[in-house]
Amino acid sequence: MQISVNEFLTPRHIDVQVVSPTRAKITLEPLERGFGHTLGNALRRILLSSMPGCAVVEAEIDGVLHEYSAIEGVQEDVIEILLNLKGLAIKLHGRDEVTLTLSKKGSGVVTAADIQLDHDVEIVNPDHVIANLASNGALNMKLTVARGRGYEPADSRQTDEDESRSIGRLQLDASFSPVRRIAYVVENARVEQRTNLDKLVIDLETNGTLDPEEAIRRAATILQQQLAAFVDLKGDSEPVVVEQEDEIDPILLRPVDDLELTVRSANCLKAENIYYIGDLIQRTEVELLKTPNLGKKSLTEIKDVLASRGLSLGMRLDNWPPASLKKDDKATA
């Protein structure tokens, strides 16, 4: 069918090329001329500045009073150790801040795997090197890991109370974003006789705590929510008060079918009226194991799939289900 030159095109072809577990290339076409850069730049800025993540924000090392110190028997100085701590890829399931400990002595390499973890903390890059010890070396430290968004300088977190007890507690500039690299190119596209169209190719790499495809979805959702205010824009002279629900992660509103579980696991969940991911994460392991025909193998599968999306069982949602999620929707989920 001939497409009119006056018809405003919307993208009809989306291709996701998985380069590695942490990198993907997403192609979107066709786009009207100029929209490749418009959308590419907007998504790039959101991905770099607005993706939530976790990072080490404070370190307390035995025998160290300030970052310009050196530790006997440790090859790296304190500044190098702090820089290495910034490279940790950490996921917190259900908490906004935790304190972790690391203790090692004797000759060898200190890696992220040497950090003692709580049950709801995961380090995606356990082979990441933190320091190298000589035979007489020892490294003992406490690490504070927090959840945040974007980039946060250390001095922005300090209060008057912190100033009085900051000796030995080393503050780190924190880059919370799970996005390591984002680039986009705009190529030519063609639809029938129209040759002046755009094709947007996004090359995205994360630190492994967030799937690249999910990062794109979240960035697009943020952009959509911000632009929604302009859709119903009116020239009212009086300010309009908009009642807004507490923000809920869009992934929680998606059906459990999107998790691509085995048929057995999916059917067991639906038999328990678990239709949405938000329903699922509020269940505990004990509750799920009471589900008929759902055994430990299915439970492990569910936990692994949730963990790959930064979620876990036993999480608490204060405003679930949201008003926008109607009960009769579940009948068709």
From Swiss-Prot:
Transmembrane segments: none annotated. Its EC number is 2.7.7.6. InterPro entries: DNA-dir_RNA_pol_insert, DNA-dir_RNA_pol_RpoA/D/Rpb3, DNA-dir_RpoA, RBP11-like, RNAP_asu_C, RNApol_insert_sf. GO terms for molecular function: DNA binding; DNA-directed RNA polymerase activity; protein dimerization activity. It is an enzyme of class 2 (transferase). This is DNA-directed RNA polymerase subunit alpha. It comes from Pseudomonas putida (strain ATCC 47054 / DSM 6125 / CFBP 8728 / NCIMB 11950 / KT2440). GO terms for cellular component: cytoplasm; DNA-directed RNA polymerase complex.
